[in-house]
Amino acid sequence: MQTCLVVDDSSIVRKIARRILEGLDFQVIEAEDGVDALVVCKKAMPEAVLLDWNMPVMDGYHFLSHLRRMPGGETPRVVFCTTENGIEHISRALEGGANEYIMKPFDKEIIAAKFQEVGLIAVPV
């Protein structure tokens, strides 16, 4: 079973994402900011990260920068999931190492489609 780290300062968003991802057969680990997420990644690198941009302590962009420099940090597929919808944020995220970018609010279909695009879920035949 693949593991997805959900990084968001909102416990409600984490709970919704957990339900969706568990329904897609992912084991889910949660972190409420980038610092907590780095601790998780140092213990065991997940296959996927669903990442918010705006969080206290360390935001998603800075987490991504640290992640990509860690041993094994190039491996996880990172999907930003945020309210930041400007082209400058999207470009910055993708240039910084994100694999995909989705806007909140999200649903199962949106997450499944993006996870298929980055190779985390098989495309139905």
Describe every region a protein language model picked out.
Residues 33-36, 59-65:
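Acidic catalytic/metal-coordinating carboxylates
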Residues 62, 85-100, 110-113:
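Alpha4 helix (beta4-alpha4-beta5 surface) of REC/receiver domains from two-component response regulators
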Residues 104:
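A Lys-centered signature of the CheY-like receiver
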Residues 55:
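Receiver (REC) domain active-site loop signature in two-component systems and cognate sites
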Residues 44-50:
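Active-site beta3 strand of CheY-like receiver
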Residues 15-23:
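Charged docking surfaces used in two-component/phosphorelay signaling
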Residues 25-32, 40:
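Short hydrophobic/Thr-rich beta-strand motif most characteristic of the beta2 strand and flanking loop
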